[in-house]
């Protein structure tokens, strides 16, 4: 049975939605930011030389025994609590048996029928509508190694001449977060992963960098005929699982493509094969991987080398009490306290400056000006330099000082940008840069008056037009004064003075 969509263009997504309902469930793997691996003391640093962070335990050598990493358990409980899950007072690990080169033990220590966290939820908002996504379970496991396929054009095993394996990643602590099949659109799928990423980042338990693989998403997609009114429980169709999506854009595009691919097969009278699939970012299409296993294929059984985990209620409640402010609560607070809109906060988050803006406000800046300077000026500079905004050599306190000087009329926006230039160049604090570069607005009224007089004498025709009522013609005169003052004047004040001298109210 073919898994390739029929020849010709796929149906439009809107046409598919008129006839079918997408049913989407997401499995998200999150690498926990512990200093050592899940069951041994090996380091977890990203980017180390291949096979330099390994030991007999994570290589599965005979006689080695695992020991549970307490920090990983703590981080997993925190994630479960933040997702409103029930935390098991007793759970245990299981062996998931399969053979693959990147799995040195030929089994993975995971959890099966007795996971750590169950029955949670996460609310996500798309275009003003809140969607609640149920969380089936959050369980702990160890990551696999990483296969590197050499000699092909795509970096995949097909077409490669040989493969290499790096076991540095083998044994790194993971949590797998599995949703209910509650998602009904690519947009909600993307929003869920985005919100989950922000929540985990707020907890401080992972850097959730999708481009480095510390957050990876598998999307399970099936279609069913659009349910008739009053029949919400129509059976689901056969699902495919698109593996290892490593960006928000890929999550949305892969789900959308799978929806249209499956619709084309069903329309052609074919059936959907339960299989894993791979998403190609360049083409925006998925391709067949392998048939999808059932749980029985993995021959799960309790891990004999680890005792069950029994978590005291006091331990869980202590972690609950210590949770930081979570993204939804933070958004509500910032909207209430500072007058931001939900779109403002999304823009700040997308630019990676939300924390910096809040720190700038705490240093004394007005919310609107803090947002303006970080979003419109500093985020752009960071992007141009290939940096994260946090890595710029300017602090929230510096930005608050600059905005205060602008508000007091001691700097114009143009001068403020020059001050930022100096701070970023390492010339000192904003006040030191102003003194060193001579950037303050000139307070000498006689100098400004002389510049105004010179501008009027130099352009009598423009002056006459303004006197005649063409007030907007004053622009070139303002420019001439600002040039003479080397930008160290308030343009609005210059305009007022020119109009006064020309007798125009």
Curated annotation (Swiss-Prot):
Pfam family, one: GatB_Yqey
Enzyme Commission (EC) number: 6.3.5.-
InterPro entries given in the database record: Asn/Gln-tRNA_amidoTrfase_suB/E, Asn/Gln-tRNA_Trfase_suB/E_cat, Asn/Gln_amidotransferase, Asn/Gln_tRNA_amidoTrase-B-like, GatB, GatB_Yqey_C_2, Gln-tRNA_amidoTrfase_suB_CS, Gln_synth/guanido_kin_cat_dom
Top enzyme class: ligase
Domain of life: Bacteria
Keyword Manganese: no
Keywords noted in UniProt: ATP-binding, Ligase, Nucleotide-binding, Protein biosynthesis
Catalytic activity of the protein: L-glutamyl-tRNA(Gln) + L-glutamine + ATP + H2O = L-glutaminyl-tRNA(Gln) + L-glutamate + ADP + phosphate + H(+); L-aspartyl-tRNA(Asn) + L-glutamine + ATP + H2O = L-asparaginyl-tRNA(Asn) + L-glutamate + ADP + phosphate + 2 H(+)
Residue pairs linked by disulfide bridges in the UniProt entry: none
GO biological process terms, semicolon-separated: glutaminyl-tRNAGln biosynthesis via transamidation; translation
Ranges for region Disordered: 220-241
MF terms (GO), sorted A to Z: asparaginyl-tRNA synthase (glutamine-hydrolyzing) activity; ATP binding; glutaminyl-tRNA synthase (glutamine-hydrolyzing) activity
NCBIfam families: gatB, PRK05477.1-2, PRK05477.1-3, PRK05477.1-4
Subunit record text: Heterotrimer of A, B and C subunits.
Function: Allows the formation of correctly charged Asn-tRNA(Asn) or Gln-tRNA(Gln) through the transamidation of misacylated Asp-tRNA(Asn) or Glu-tRNA(Gln) in organisms which lack either or both of asparaginyl-tRNA or glutaminyl-tRNA synthetases. The reaction takes place in the presence of glutamine and ATP through an activated phospho-Asp-tRNA(Asn) or phospho-Glu-tRNA(Gln).
Recorded family membership: Belongs to the GatB/GatE family. GatB subfamily.
Protein name according to UniProt: Aspartyl/glutamyl-tRNA(Asn/Gln) amidotransferase subunit B
Organism (species): Frankia casuarinae (strain DSM 45818 / CECT 9043 / HFP020203 / CcI3)
């Amino acid at each position: 049975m073919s898994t390739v969509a029929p020849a010709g263009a796929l149906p439009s997504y809107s046409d598919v939605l008129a006839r079918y309902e997408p049913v989407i469930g997401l499995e998200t793997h999150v690498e926990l930011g512990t200093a050592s691996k899940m069951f041994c003391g090996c380091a977890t640093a990203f980017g180390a030389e291949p096979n330099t962070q390994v030991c007999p335990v994570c290589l599965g050598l005979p006689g080695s025994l695992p020991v549970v990493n307490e920090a990983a358990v703590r981080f997993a409980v925190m994630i479960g609590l933040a997702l409103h899950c029930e935390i098991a007072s007793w759970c245990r690990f299981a062996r998931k048996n399969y053979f693959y080169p990147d799995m040195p033990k030929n089994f993975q220590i995971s959890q099966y029928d007795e996971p750590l966290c169950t029955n949670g939820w996460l609310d996500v908002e798309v275009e003003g509508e809140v969607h609640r996504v149920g969380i089936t379970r959050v369980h702990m496991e160890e990551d696999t190694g990483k296969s590197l396929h050499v000699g092909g054009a795509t970096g995949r095993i097909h077409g490669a001449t040989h493969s290499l394996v790096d076991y540095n990643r083998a044994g790194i602590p993971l949590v797998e977060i599995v949703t209910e099949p509650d998602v009904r659109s690519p947009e909600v799928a993307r929003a869920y992963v985005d919100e989950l990423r922000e929540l985990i980042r707020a907890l401080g338990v992972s850097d959730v960098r999708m481009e480095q693989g510390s957050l990876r998403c598998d999307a399970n997609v099936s279609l069913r005929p659009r349910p008739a009114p009053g029949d919400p429980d129509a059976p689901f169709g056969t699902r495919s699982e698109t593996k290892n999506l490593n960006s928000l854009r890929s999550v949305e595009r892969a789900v959308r493509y799978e929806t249209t691919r499956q619709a084309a097969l069903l329309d052609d009278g074919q059936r959907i094969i339960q299989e894993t699939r791979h998403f190609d970012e360049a083409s925006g299409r998925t391709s067949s991987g392998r048939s999808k296993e059932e749980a029985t294929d993995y021959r799960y059984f309790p891990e004999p080398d680890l005792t069950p985990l029994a978590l005291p209620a006091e331990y869980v409640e202590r972690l609950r009490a210590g949770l930081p402010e979570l993204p939804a609560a933070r958004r509500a607070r910032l909207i209430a306290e500072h007058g931001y809109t939900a779109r403002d906060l999304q823009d700040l988050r997308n630019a990676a400056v939300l924390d910096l803006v809040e720190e700038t406000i705490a240093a004394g800046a007005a919310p609107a000006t803090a947002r303006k300077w970080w979003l419109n000026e500093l985020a752009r500079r960071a992007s141009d330099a290939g940096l994260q905004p946090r890595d710029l050599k300017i602090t929230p306190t510096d930005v608050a000082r600059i905005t205060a000087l602008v508000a007091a009329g001691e700097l114009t926006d143009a001068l403020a940008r020059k001050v930022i230039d100096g701070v970023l160049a390492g010339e000192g604090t904003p006040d030191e840069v102003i003194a060193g570069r001579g950037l303050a607005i000139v307070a000498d009224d006689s100098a400004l008056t002389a510049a105004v007089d010179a501008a009027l004498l130099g352009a009598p025709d423009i002056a006459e037009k303004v006197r005649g009522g063409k007030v907007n013609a004053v622009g070139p005169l303002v420019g001439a004064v600002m040039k003479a003052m080397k930008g160290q004047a308030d343009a609005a004040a210059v305009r007022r003075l020119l109009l006064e001298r020309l007798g125009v109210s």
